[in-house]
Structures are given as C-alpha cells and as structure tokens.
C-alpha cells in the first residue's frame, strides 16, 4: 500500500474522517428505521454509541486493509463496490462477535446490525460514486501524461479505449519523442508537443500532473533522466509502461516483459511453506463447507446425467482427465461429465463456446459451474486450490510452452477451481486465447494474496448465481 506525499496523506486522512462520520450518522438513521419499520427499540444510548463508534472505526480500518484509501487506487466502480462489501462484511462479523461476547447482557434489536450494515454499504457506494465522478479530494483520480507516442504507447490507446478502463485517471495525452515508430503510433489529435528539458517541470506543475508513464519505443539516449528524477523528487510518480498496464488492467502484458523486470519486480514470491500449509488448511475447511452445502445438488446432478445417457455404452457420470498442476506435476482432474462419451474419439480438442459435443444437461451444469464440484476431491488431495490458474491438459501445455513466452510460470502456484483469468477473459479455445489468459494468470501469480483471493471468490459467486459461466 502506498500513501504518497504529505498532500496525498492529508487527502486520505480526510476521506477516512469523513467516512467515519458518515457511518456514525448511518447508524443513527438505522436505529430510527428499525424502530419505525419493525417497531423494535434498538438499545440504550450509551451502548448504542459504543456499538456505532466501534463499527464505524472497524469499517474504515477494514477499508484501509483492502485498499479503499490507497492514494493510487485505480478501480472500476464494480471493483470499488466489492471492496466496500468486503470491508463492511469483515466489520459486521467482528461487531457481532464483540456484541455477543461483551454486550450479551444488553437487549439489542435483532434487526439493527443487518440494517446498519446494509445501509452502510449502500451509502458508501453512493458517496464513492459521486466522489469519483466529481473528482472531489482527488482521491482515486490522477492526471497522467505518457512519454512516447509510438508502437508501445499505442498499447494504452488500444487496450483502454472505454471510459470504464480509465475510471481512476485522466489521460492528458502522449508526448512524442525521437525514436518512436509513428506509423504504428498515436494520432495527432492526442499528441502533446512539449520539450522534455529543464522547463518540463513547469509543464508538470501547471497541469497538476500526478504521474508520468514511460512508453517510448527507444530509451537509450532519448530519456532525460535528470528531468524525470527531478519530477520524482517533486512527488510525481514515474512509471514504466509494463507496470502501468499491470496496475490499471489487472494483467501482465507478456509481449512487454523483459527478463530484468521479472527478476527485480516485486511479487512472484510463490515459495512459502508456512503459507502453503495455511492455504491447504483453509482450502480443506472451505471444501468441507461447500461439500456440505452442495451435496444434494451433486447427487441430483449425478442421477440426471446417469439417466440422460442410460442407453449409451460407456456413459459414466464422472470423467477423469490428466492435467498439469503445481510445478508441472501431472494429476487427474475429476468432473461431472458434460460432453458425449465419444467427444474425443479423434483425439484431444479445445473446448469452444456452444460446443456441439456438450449434452443438454452439460449445457446447464457448465453454465452454473456445477460440473466443477467433484474437483473438491482434488482440493482435499492437495492437488488444487479454490483459487488459482485453471489447469490445462499436458497435450496443450507442451504446445503452449513452445509458442508463448513465460507460459510455464503459471505452474508456480497450484491450479484452482476459479481463477483471475476466468473472470476477466471469455472462454478460451486457441493459442491466442491462452496468450490473453496468461496475462491474467501471471498477474495472479505475481500478486497472490488473501485479499485478491477474496475478491475472486466474490466475483465467482456472482458468476455461479447468475449463470454467467460457459
């Protein structure tokens, strides 16, 4: 988490103070709402004030831990909603424990805390929306200028055309410099013609620039290092194109990667035995909970699959398929069968959207990810995690390693039931699709954390509940 210069720290502190006051006021409104709607008295004034105060501080602290007050936070609005939801959910759980442990002798309306938490989520979402739209406090909104207007700089223009892709920043334009490939570069109307010399700092201060992104095609002899260093000393962030794209798009652009960046950049710290043991324990607990909740659906699915192809020879309910797992080790994945028994009579094939080999039952269970549930056994075995890159077949992996740089690095973490790539890229069925998905897989490998796993789980639940699967 980065907090920036003193000006930015004051902005962040101001935001936290404002939201503490807002949450306290929401607590007051919630008490009246509960009394009016449910005709239920909340609690005595002293205990009420204590509860509201603790909850308000907890929400802000949780928000701080998930990056809601980070100066350089760039998120889509849906991403901000998820962070607000997580911070309030954590706070709600803690305040429930505190209330039941230390305030168990106080009569508190059973409707109050759920109402308070729900209204807090709603009010914070509305507040953040208008805050970002109006650019108040400058939090989450930064002015950016790109040095370079050639082929590399055009990647930003191509991948960030939509307004939602630029939700957290304002792009002033591109500064062309010597050595840029202008044939593949930026069009004239988006260019800024300014010399990067000792007067460049005046341009930066006059336009209140927060960040400079280096995206020139040729660096040697074209970048004024002293001028850029002076900008950094003045509190302006200077970023590489690869780091900028990683931060803003949630992916690592593979064709921009170079060996020194992989070696020296933060992240990619996958080998940690203590964390691995903790992850396995948490995965087993989660798998047990999911199994207890889903076993009736699994039993019903197995019966329906059995009767759908009851007269077809060798039509099993489950199927096993070899996949490449952690550190390249092979294992057998277990799934409900969603394709015809003879789906691969001619050899391994990429699965495609609207694949004709998928059965009628298979279409439904794939849409709601029910076919993945037997992989809970793979989780118990330690072959898979809940969150991680989806495992591929060895026949495809051999080809992909030959054709895609750094593809093998996705095997540095355990494969998962759900992954960052599956949420951000449509169903892949080719080498080109695998290249795009790898950008998100590498982002996950580099930034693997509990917070990222929680966000992926929340979005995966949305996919399952609303049938946004394959």
Model-flagged regions — what are they?
Residues 84, 88, 140-158, 313-339:
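Membrane-cytosol interface motif
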Residues 351-414, 456-460, 464:
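A short, structured surface patch at a secondary-structure boundary
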Residues 38, 381, 404-470:
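C-terminal terminal-structure detector
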Residues 1-21, 126-295:
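N-terminal hydrophobic signal-anchor/signal peptide
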């Amino acid at each position: 988490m980065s907090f920036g210069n003193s000006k930015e720290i004051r902005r962040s502190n101001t935001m936290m103070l404002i939201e503490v006051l807002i949450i306290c006021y929401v607590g007051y409104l919630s008490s009246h709402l509960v009394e009016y709607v449910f005709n239920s008295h909340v609690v005595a004034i002293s205990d009420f004030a204590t509860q509201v105060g603790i909850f308000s501080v907890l929400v802000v602290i949780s928000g701080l831990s998930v990056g809601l007050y980070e100066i350089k936070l760039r998120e889509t609005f849906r991403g901000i909603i998820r962070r607000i939801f997580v911070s309030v959910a954590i706070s709600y759980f803690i305040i429930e424990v505190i209330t039941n442990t230390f305030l168990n002798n106080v009569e508190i309306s059973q409707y109050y805390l759920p109402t308070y938490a729900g209204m807090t989520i709603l009010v914070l979402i509305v507040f953040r929306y208008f805050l970002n739209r109006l650019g108040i406090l400058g939090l989450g909104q930064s002015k950016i200028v790109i040095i370079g207007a050639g082929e590399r700089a055009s990647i930003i223009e191509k991948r960030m055309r939509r307004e939602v892709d630029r939700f957290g920043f304002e792009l002033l334009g591109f500064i062309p410099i010597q050595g840029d490939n202008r044939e593949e570069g930026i069009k004239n109307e988006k260019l800024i013609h300014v010399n990067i010399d000792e007067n460049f700092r005046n341009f930066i201060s006059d336009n209140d620039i927060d960040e400079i992104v280096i995206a020139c095609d040729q660096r040697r002899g074209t970048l004024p290092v002293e001028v850029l260093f002076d900008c950094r000393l003045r509190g302006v962030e200077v970023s590489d194109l690869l780091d900028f794209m990683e931060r803003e798009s949630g992916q690592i652009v593979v064709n921009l990667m170079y060996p020194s960046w992989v070696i020296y950049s933060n992240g990619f710290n996958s080998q940690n035995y203590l964390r691995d043991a903790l992850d396995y324990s948490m995965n087993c607990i989660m798998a047990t909970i999911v199994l207890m909740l889903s076993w009736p659906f699994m039993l019903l699915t197995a019966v329906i699959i059995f009767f759908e192809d009851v007269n077809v020879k060798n039509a099993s309910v489950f199927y096993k398929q070899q996949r490449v797992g952690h550190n390249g080790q092979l294992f057998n994945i277990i799934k409900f069968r969603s394709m015809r028994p003879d789906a691969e009579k001619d050899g391994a094939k990429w699965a495609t959207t609207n694949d004709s080999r998928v059965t009628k039952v298979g279409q439904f269970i794939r849409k709601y990810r029910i076919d993945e549930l037997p992989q809970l056994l793979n989780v118990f075995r330690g072959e898979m995690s809940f969150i991680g890159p989806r495992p591929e077949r060895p026949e495809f992996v051999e080809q992909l390693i030959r054709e895609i740089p750094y593809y093998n690095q996705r095997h540095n973490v355990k494969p998962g039931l759900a992954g960052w790539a599956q949420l951000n890229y449509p169903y892949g069925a080719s080498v080109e699709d695998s290249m795009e998905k790898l950008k998100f897989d590498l982002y996950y490998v580099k930034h693997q954390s509990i917070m990222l796993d929680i966000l992926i789980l929340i979005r995966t639940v949305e996919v399952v509940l609303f049938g946004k699967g394959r």
